[in-house]
């Protein structure tokens, strides 16, 4: 059973954190950071999302600290934010500064590159033109492209290479060759060759790469808008009440047990319990319901929800990363940072990409010289530089994470939480959905609508029934308890309570055994049903109501009719699933007539009644043996075995249970109509991932041979390094823009 933990309480006592990473310039950098952290003792799993600039790490805090990880990452030439009170805010501030510097460098590089290109391609005979171009190119390299050379050298000293290496190497070769020809033109003139210079290539390559990075940063910022929106729900400060006085403090200062004051129109800062006052609270960010919820003393309120009317005080019960909102944010971040199975292959390719490209560039240079000798030296150099420039590991590195970020973020906005890329990929392959009835297709708030007592002395039996149901965890137990409380039933002394899995409960009072549950208990206790009672049961079942049997020893005492309304959106959800070609099945522990009624109402062709938890698991296995990809949808209580067995486990959440949910997919609002939307979203996201990867691979497969001059013998076409740099910049941006299309898909 797959599960993502925010805090795993198993024997390893591992924790999972999402930490911002700085100074990464391409996908190769992400791989370097990931391998550096993964190699540390005490780290169970590390995954770097280049698009988000984050490290998701699962580690044992008793073996390794975050500071040790930070030191290792810094030693590798990058930075990891671990000590800040608000690491996300710090990352955003650094990202803003980085973007500001990047924009300034891009504008500066283009300001000098335009006259440089004009001098090199149009006004080639201007006096001292070569010297002017040399100064312009050198200024671009030093003032606006310095980071490429600093990072390239830094990684080279560590025996590593990345995209900065390719840019630094290509522009340096073009500049040094041009400088040699400017200083020693006679070397080539003596051989009867023209001493060409390519200063404009050095400058324009840097300008195009910077422009591509600027556009990429803008686009990547859009991919993370959903998670930023979730983070923005939580206020930065809270009004702490101490000895009757209010003081505004950062929410990071709040502790469990603190008393906080909340005024009308304000966002609630932490999870807690309302102490004084009453109000209506907008919980749509969690529940999806636009109608405000009335809150009174003793009620639970959640961080990020909005207090609409009255002022109140509350006691903090969850702060920081333990609030429901923080748990959701961490879940989405972890999901965005997860890797699709295909990404493992991409990572391996990215790891060797730069060395292979450098080798191809060298072979290109050698081949040109072998074919044409010294007269082709300029062609050889230009082609080698073009190969270095056009190759783009970033497009490969961005293909999967950008699509995942947009897809997972869009899901969160629609109240759909997908745990990781594995779940996403499995969800898109689902062709069969198995639905539990109670709480999935129905409201999950059953009520007792009728009762039939065989015994006359039912007052005593009401107390016993009340005691038995108080200990039961079955969804129908709450309905019976509410009904009994209205009848004035009380708890009585009891012993030997036993839960009969899938059937009901058994309890002893004063040495006498009582039982309550499904019709299967009649066989266990050999109790019969009077004919007049049987007719009443038949009528209830015809109406789609569930029947609960209550007895003493071998005698049936009473039967209760319980109704659980079908959700308004269930029929539409089933219809949408069928439109997508998905086979829908219904499993329920209720009787056959109830199952028939629900299946007929919702137009579900396959159903099975009177199933116990192990029956549900066997049903899932039987479908899988037929070659079907099965998703199981349930409430996670009685369906745990089936959920674990299914290819995709889907839980119907209720907003406040999110942090404890271990299903692959959680529908936060318990609205089944979210399910077809989740499957559609998974298909769209996976399709985009493969589109991005196809484009990234095809771009490099076609671009590198073109840059090497494969068309030159055919039509004399040789790709200019400046055009190669433009193509490289476009490839990364196009991948991100393609991922952003997902935002607007229905």
Predicted regions span which residues?
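Conserved cytosolic catalytic loops of P-type ATPases
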Residues: 41-63, 199, 228-322, 422-465, ...
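Transmembrane helix-loop-helix hairpins at the membrane interface
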Residues: 101-237, 348, 451, 719
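Conserved catalytic phosphorylation-site environment of P-type ATPases
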Residues: 286, 382, 392-468, 623, ...
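Flexible metal-binding regulatory segments at protein termini and peripheral loops
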Residues: 3-128, 154, 245-246, 326, ...
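Juxtamembrane coupling segments of multi-pass membrane pumps/enzymes
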Residues: 203-264, 295, 345, 418, ...
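Conserved ATP-binding TGD loop and adjacent catalytic N/P-domain core of P-type ATPases
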Residues: 14, 31, 418, 509-511, ...
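Membrane-embedded alpha-helical bundles of multi-pass transporters
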Residues: 122-125, 157, 176, 410, ...
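Signature of the cytosolic headpiece of P-type E1-E2 ATPases
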Residues: 8, 476, 485-597, 612
